[in-house]
């Protein structure tokens, strides 16, 4: 039995929505959402199959090339990341509160002073971030800071600034308008992480997400 499913897709960045919206929350463009209908067919075993999708390829036919990695200006960081940070990748920097994740993330950006970077914080104000950066005494010439808890506004800033690396600190302190749930809830964290990953892949911008891990 066939079943049609309707969704709306942004023609500019590929973001999806279950309903028609005027402004894309990912790329910020207006009037780019178009209706897309997919047909799902129920199988005899009770499963479903999609008529549209990726096709299987022989491994030897897949074209692959070595990714250009970003030098983190640290031999230890480069080693942990397999030789550097891959553009479009998402890295989770997790740990218990208070162990220095935010300081480490800021140090990473300040080591990359020759590159344009963005530090988006939902925990500290711009003044607090500047004071902490001055204590680290690194190169902040091309470092942008943003005190914001809205995922949409953070991604808008990334689109505007076009940094080569973005830190979001922390994933538990930001929220998206696309779902009705409190900031820090599991549904918000999952949705925000998924949206950031989608944006990173589409725009080829690497992100480092700071995440708190509680004993509970």
Give residue ranges: language-model regions.
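The Walker A/P-loop phosphate-binding site
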Residues: 48-139, 155
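Short Cys/His-rich micro-motifs in 6-15 aa windows
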Residues: 28-38
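Substrate-engagement module of ASCE P-loop NTPases
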Residues: 187-208, 212
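Flexible beta-alpha connector loops of hexameric P-loop NTPases
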Residues: 66-67, 141-148, 176-190
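Short metal-coordination and nucleic-acid-contact micro-motifs, chiefly zinc-binding Cys/His arrays
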Residues: 4-6, 20-23
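Short cysteine-rich clusters marking metal-coordination/redox-active sites
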Residues: 10-13, 24-27
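Conserved nucleotide-binding/hydrolysis micro-motifs of P-loop NTPases
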Residues: 31-32, 97-99, 123-127, 135, ...
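Proline-aspartate-enriched helix->loop->beta-strand connector
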Residues: 158, 162-168
